[in-house]
Amino acid sequence: MSIMLPINNNFSLPQNSFYNTISGTYADYFSAWDKWEKQALPGEERDEAVSRLKECLINNSDELRLDRLNLSSLPDNLPAQITLLNVSYNQLTNLPELPVTLKKLYSASNKLSELPVLPPALESLQVQHNELENLPALPDSLLTMNISYNEIVSLPSLPQALKNLRATRNFLTELPAFSEGNNPVVREYFFDRNQISHIPESILNLRNECSIHISDNSLSSHAL
């Protein structure tokens, strides 16, 4: 018995079926990441970073951890679905555009001098031990922020939802205005070791349960 198969002159076997079925969906991502990997500086673990990026994308993971890889930069196109990004303890001087889904950003102990536009749903911003001189507008969703050990002179408006702020060892000369109103949020803010010379009267708007730490500043005897 013989079996006749239809002839398809346009058919050809893929050189790598896994790449075509899995990574074909993400070809633009993979191509950009592979190019970025080839531009690695000595000591950077970009091969490990790309491996984690691809795994994150293929598995649709909501967390991407690229910390402690001695990276000097990140690729421009991060996985769009992530809600947590950890790039702490690298050599980063800037960050690319961040996914709009991001809720937690950890980028401590780098060399950042500025931050990109922050995602609208961001809840936690941890960027202590950098070289930041200012901050972008803070999203209303922000709950916790650590900006200690930077070079920040002034703060943007603080979100009403912000519960915990650590701004120790910066160059702040004044505290932000506090407009508590009927907001039930119990706050704990740390402004120790700055250059603050007076306390705004708006601090009296805070609930009794709130704590403002301002030791080791330049407060005068008539600070309030």
Give the ranges of each region predicted by the language model.
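The feature captures the LRR N-terminal capping module
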Residues: 2-89, 94-97, 103-109, 113-117, ...
